[in-house]
Amino acid sequence: MSKEKFTRTKPHVNVGTIGHVDHGKTTLTAALTKCMAAKFGGEFKAYDQIDAAPEERARGITIATAHVEYESAARHYAHVDCPGHADYVKNMITGAAQMDGAILVVSAADGPMPQTREHILLARQVGVPYIVVFLNKADMVDDPELLELVEMEVRELLSKYDFPGDDIPIIKGSALKALEGDGSEIGVPAVEALVQALDDYIPEPERAIDRPFLMPIEDVFSISGRGTVVTGRVERGIIKVGEEIEIVGIRPTAKTTCTGVEMFRKLLDQGQAGDNIGVLLRGTKREDVERGQVLAKPGSITPHTHFEAEIYVLSKEEGGRHTPFFNGYRPQFYFRTTDVTGAVTLPEGVEMVMPGDNVKIEVKLIAPIAMDEGLRFAVREGGRTVGAGVVSKIIE
C-alpha cells in the first residue's frame, strides 16, 4: 500500500488518553502511532519511549507528559499521554496540554474504576468538550453479554457527569494485539476505527483567530499628543483600527475605540491572535486603565467575583505549602497578568486540603476579573505559586 504524502495542510486537533491505571492508555498510544504511521506516514513511538515521559514545568508545576503525533485521512493529531494519575490531574487543571477531545480507555476486564470516574469528572470540570471511548482488553472477556454490560456501565458513568453517554462512540478492541500487528477485528482494525471515530465525532476546534477579540493588558503608557497606549499579547481574535472595544475587569466596564495598533514600532491596521501589540485608545486616560484588565470585543466577556474552580495544590516537593489550608483560606488568585485576593470555601464535608491534593472550591474575589469558564489561574501566596486552577462554573 503506498503511503499517502505527509502534509502539514491538515487541520490540527489535540487529543489525549485518560483512564484508570493499567487499563492500557500507553499501549493504546503506542498502537495509535504504529497503525497510523503504517497507513499515513509519521513516526512509530514504542511503549518504552512513551512511558519514559520527560518532566516539564508548567506554571511552576512539574508534570510528566509524553507527546506523540499521528495522521488520519483528514487530520493531524497531537496526542498526550501521562505516566501517573497525579500527572493527569495536573495536566488537565493547568491546561498544559489543552485537549479538544479525550480518549477514555477502560479495561473490558475491570470495567470503570475510581480513576475512570475521576478523569471523567476532571474532563467535565476543566471543559474537555468531547470524549471517545476505547474498551480495551476485549480479548480477555469471552462473554459478549459481559462486554455489553461494561459498555452500559461506561455510558451511565459518562451521562452522570453530563457527557452524552448514549451517543458517545465506544470502540472495542485490544491495544496490545493492535501493537503486535494482529489483523483480526479487535487488533489493527479496532485502532483504525478509533481514529475514524475521532475524525467523525470530535469537531474541528475553532481557531484562536476566529474567536472574539481579547487582549490581557500588561502595561499602560501615556504618549503625549497621542493618548493612552496599552500593550499585551492578543489571546484571541482580531482588532482593527476604528473598532469599538471594552475595557473589562477590576473597575466598571468602559467602552473605548482603538485608534491605532502598533507592533515593533510600526503602525498596522490590525493585530491578531499571537501578536504582541500596543493599542492606542481614544479618550481613555492613563489612570483609567491598569494591568490585569482586558481589552475585548464588546459584550464578549464579563467581569465576575464569585466562581467555582477545580484546583491542584502543589506538594511540598514542588515548592508548595508544607501545611494544609482550611475553609476561609485567603490567597491571591493570579489571572492572566495580575493577582487578586479571594476567599476560599471548601465543599461540604471537606475539613482541610493537603499539599498534593486536588479539590473543587468556591472563590469570592475582592475585585472583579474578566472571566469565562475554562479560564486558568495560579494560586499564590506573596508571589509564590502554591496551586493551579481552572474556573469550572461562574456563580456571579
Curated annotation (Swiss-Prot):
The reaction(s) this protein catalyses: GTP + H2O = GDP + phosphate + H(+)
Region (G2): 60-64
UniProt feature coiled coil, ranges: none
EC number: 3.6.5.3
GO CC field: cytosol
Database matches in PROSITE patterns: G_TR_1, G_TR_2
Entry keywords, A to Z: Cytoplasm, Elongation factor, GTP-binding, Hydrolase, Magnesium, Metal-binding, Nucleotide-binding, Protein biosynthesis
Predominant localisation class: cytoplasm
Domain annotation tr-type G: ranges: 10-206
Localization, UniProt: Cytoplasm
Sample GO molecular function, one term: GTPase activity
InterPro entries the record matches: EF-Tu_GTP-bd (IPR041709), EF-Tu_GTPase (IPR050055), EFTu-like_2 (IPR004161), EFTU_2 (IPR033720), G_TR_CS (IPR031157), P-loop_NTPase (IPR027417), Small_GTP-bd (IPR005225), T_Tr_GTP-bd_dom (IPR000795)
Region of interest: G3: 81-84
A Pfam family of this chain: GTP_EFTU_D2
Residues annotated for GTP binding in this entry: 19-26, 81-85, 136-139
Region described as G5: spans on this chain: 174-176
Enzyme class (EC, first level): hydrolase
Residues reported in the UniProt entry to bind Mg(2+): 26
Function: GTP hydrolase that promotes the GTP-dependent binding of aminoacyl-tRNA to the A-site of ribosomes during protein biosynthesis.
NCBIfam families in alphabetical order: EF-Tu (TIGR00485), PRK00049.1 (NF000766), PRK12735.1 (NF009372), PRK12736.1 (NF009373), small_GTP (TIGR00231)
Oligomer and partners: Monomer.
Family note: Belongs to the TRAFAC class translation factor GTPase superfamily. Classic translation factor GTPase family. EF-Tu/EF-1A subfamily.
Protein name: Elongation factor Tu
Record lineage: Bacteria, Pseudomonadati, Pseudomonadota, Gammaproteobacteria, Methylococcales
